[in-house]
């Protein structure tokens, strides 16, 4: 059940593999895009959003070959009207859930890469670091062994808030969807 009208639109548009391929080809940095075989992208049925957060988020999971290895592209849609400091923590939780599922399938296998992507449509421009480690108190002064204890990952953020300046590009269906979520942030 989709709790928010934006969820249905998100899942219909980006749930269509051709639109997801177009989004990745249009928005990912070229050095990342060249590692992904977009022709191998397949939608997965899983969602990892907790029930109490479904009002604020929707997600899609895709399987793809990245550097000739099975991997995932995880897209999180952020419905909140403001930047959320905890998105990195939530992504880490969802990525762990994806890896847990993989471990249950085959225990001794190495875990697949997960490429985390956040689409933001809030009222204000995104103002939170996309580096997970920046969420840790005192990280900027840590060195050596302490710094090694911090999980390090970065998510790709696409800010479609009304004042972000993010250019809307791509095929018609994708542009229409992105313009619509941008306009929804104005209300």
Label every PLM stretch briefly.
Residues 1-187:
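Conserved single-residue anchors adjacent to enzymatic active/cofactor-binding motifs
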């Amino acid at each position: 059940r989709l709790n928010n009208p934006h969820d249905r639109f998100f899942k219909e548009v980006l749930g269509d593999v051709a639109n997801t391929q177009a989004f990745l080809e249009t928005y990912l940095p070229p050095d990342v895009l060249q590692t992904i075989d977009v022709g191998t992208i397949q939608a997965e049925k899983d969602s990892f959003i907790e029930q109490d957060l479904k009002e604020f988020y929707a997600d899609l999971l895709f399987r793809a070959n990245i550097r000739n290895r099975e991997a995932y592209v995880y897209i999180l849609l952020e419905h909140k009207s403001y930047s959320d400091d905890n998105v990195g923590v939530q992504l880490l939780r969802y990525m762990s859930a994806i890896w847990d599922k993989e471990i249950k399938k085959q225990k001794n296998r190495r875990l697949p890469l997960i490429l985390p992507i956040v689409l933001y449509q809030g009222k204000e421009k995104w103002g939170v670091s996309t580096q997970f480690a920046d969420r840790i108190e005192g990280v900027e002064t840590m060195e050596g062994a302490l710094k090694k204890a911090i999980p390090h990952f970065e998510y790709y953020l696409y800010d479609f808030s009304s004042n972000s300046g993010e250019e809307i590009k791509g095929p018609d269906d994708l542009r229409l969807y992105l313009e619509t979520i941008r306009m929804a942030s104005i209300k």
